[in-house]
Amino acid sequence: SAPDENDNIDQQVNILDEELARYPDVIAISSVDASACSVQFDLAIENGIPIVAFDSGNSYQNIQSTCKTNNIEAVTTGTKNFCEKIGDSGEILLLVHDTVSDTAKEREAEIKNELAANHPNVTVTETIYLDQLEMLKKQIVAEQVGVTPEELAAAEAGEKKEETTGTGDASETIADAASNAASSSADESANETAQEADNELSEKMQQVNDGAAKMSDEDAIQYYMEKHPDLKGCIATNETVTQLAIRTLDQFDSEKHITLVGFDAGKEQVNALKDGKVDGLIVQNPFGMGYATVVAAARTVLEIGNEAEVNTGYVWVTADNMNDDTITPFLYE
């Protein structure tokens, strides 16, 4: 069982609750959020149900075994090859699949560590997190219509308060928050009344919300590509953001080649690799990971012990080696 979306933490917790109610012999889980599910895990342990993690680990202390890619080794390999392709200098975008999962945190940290240690002339100009993309869309439109970051933050805080309390009119809440931001602005026109400022900013906030709702994920990523005309490339940290980067580059009208290195090798990534849209892929071993997880789960039930962490491997794939016999087993549709 899995959530409908990769980042749906609440749904994963609900699924875990349902599975625990069946009192399974063992739980194997790839955690959406590295710090989530501790209550469910405590319940599992209390009922003698061991836990095995795979793909993305969890900070919970009583997990029997974690079967996953060694992200430090994999990301170091990918980052070195990426830097070689861009001439070991220039501006890049980092596209990270979320802010909460173990894999996202590890991969982002190691990319930046490798760049700082061995590629000082390569600069990450923007780090974009997929689970923050909706807020980034609002920031983009806000900049275009003249809403300051402080005003946007105040309005967002007002909207969240309205959602929590369930009282009052949403437009009034935005206006109140906007009033607070506007009243603190040093350059507010002296002859403009507070009510006029409220109304004007409330109208702009409506434009922000409407504009953000119409903006696609690809449009948002393209905005940041266009914002940095000297951009040389992008590194994407999982399959979802790699596919997003591919679609963005398809619609991005640029005369120069933007180097793209991503993770995993589904059908879309493999086709993009063939077409030269992707320059390299860090590909995990999905079959090996699944096999290792089943073995680890069986060993916990049989009480014969496990390695705390099982490295399931990876390969570096390019258009030049993708048809090699050692590579094709890692590719999937």
Placement of each model-derived feature along the sequence:
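A residue-level marker of the well-folded mature domains of exported/periplasmic proteins
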Residues: S1-E333
